[in-house]
C-alpha cells in the first residue's frame, strides 16, 4: 500500500491525481491512500502502515503553508522507516523538513509568488550523478529525459543528502539521503509516455525498494 501525500492547497493542483494515475498504470491492483498533507502525523502513518510514501507536488509558494500545517509531515519525513519519494514540490518539502533553503529559480519580471518567475517546463534532459543501478535510477542512461514544471528549487542540499542528478537550470535535480531510503526528484516522473519512458522506470524502481 502506498501513502500518497497530497501537498496541494484545497486540492488546487493536478500532481496527486497524475501520480495516482501513473502508479495505477504500473501496478493496476496497487492500493493507494491519498491524504492531505495537513492530516499527516507519525501516528497516522504508524496506523496505516504503508510500504512506501510519496510526497506530491504543489502549485502554491511555500510561504502560503503555515509551520503548524507542515509540522506533522516534516516529522514523518525525518523519522519514518518507509522509503519516501518527494516529487517536484515533494523534494522541496523534504529539503525544508531538514532545514535546507528552497526558493525561486529566478524572477525574470516583477510579480509576487510565482508571478514573474522563471519556470522550467517540458521534457528536459537531466544528467545522473548516481552510479548505474543505484537507488531509483537503476537501468537508466547517464542522461535521462523527464518532464519538468517548477519555479522553485532546492538551493542547498540538506545535511546527509547527496545530489544524484543535475542539469543546466537546477543544480539539485535529484537527491538521496546517505543512509535512509529518502529520495527527491525535482522533475515529474509520473508524466511519462512511450517516447519518454524514463519517469516510468524511476517509479518502478521506487516501488521495488
Model-derived regions, located:
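Conserved beta-strand elements of the Class I
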Residues: 1-3, 101
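Short, charged N-terminal beta->alpha structural module
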Residues: 3-27
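Cofactor-binding loop segments of dinucleotide-utilizing enzymes, especially the Rossmann-like FAD-
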Residues: 5-7, 35, 89
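Glycine-rich His-Gly loop
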Residues: 6-8, 55-59, 151, 187-189
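Acyltransferase
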Residues: 8-11, 185-209
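Flexible gly/pro-rich beta->alpha loop and the following alpha-helix that scaffold active-site loops
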Residues: 20-86, 98
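Glycine-rich nucleophile elbow surrounding the catalytic serine of serine-hydrolase chemistry
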Residues: 88-96
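Pocket-forming structural segment of enzyme catalytic cores
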Residues: 98-178, 187-197
